[in-house]
Amino acid sequence: LTFDDGPSENTDKVLKILKKYDAKATFFVTGNNQKYNDSIRKAEKQGNTIALHTYTHDYATVYSSTEAYFNDLQQISDMVKQITGKAPKYIRFPGGSSNMVSANYSQGIMSKLDSMVHERGYEYFDWNCSSGDAASNSVPAQTIVDNSTNCNYDQIMLLFHDSSPKTSTVEALPAIIENYKSRGYVFKAISDDTPIFHHGVNN
């Protein structure tokens, strides 16, 4: 389970559900909603992994140049380190490594970032199963359940969002966890042992 774009008021709700089911997740956080930063601390204390999305999540900013990307990444890294005492080394690119948006701002930047993040000691994670909750802010909970439980891989990296509008994601989460648990899956946070999920890079 991975959650992008938090923290928000929904993050604590997600954490309660994870705790109830003894499930762990990874939160790719931003700096856009810092009044909920205590949720980052709680998530980490609960045994989840805190990872970096970007500080602004503004495509025009982060994908304008490699320098702009790493300046933004440093900001979110510093913020998380201030909260948890740790500088995360796991990241997720806004839109994923296969995003079709970055080329509007800097042609070829994703290929450059692909190698540069590794040179700087980071690892990035995409996903191989999507909840579809990014399609709009009003995706019905049942649609999210259906999308999320439609994957049968041995190792699943499932994409959710825990930003403010994603209330139906929270609503859908218990049924998704129950479905996978009934099929014998275990929910782990990303660690150095986690299989790496990369999309094909688009530029």
Locations of the language-model features?
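Terminal accessory/targeting
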Residues: L1, D12, K16-A25, N128, ...
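Active-site beta->alpha N-cap acidic-glycine motif
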Residues: L1-A87, N179, V186, P195-I196
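A cross-domain feature marking catalytic cores of carbohydrate-active enzymes
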Residues: F3-D5, V29-G31, L52-T54, R92-G95, ...
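Residue-level marker of alpha-helix boundaries and capping positions
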Residues: D5, T30, N104-Y105, T167
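Short aromatic-enriched loop/helix-cap "lid" or pocket-rim segments at secondary-structure transitions
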Residues: S39-I40, S102-S106, E171, H198-N202
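Alpha-helical scaffold elements lining the catalytic groove of polysaccharide deacetylases
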Residues: D58-K86, S97-Q155, S168-E171
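Acidic helix-start/capping segments at beta-turn-to-alpha-helix junctions
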Residues: R92-S98, I196-F197
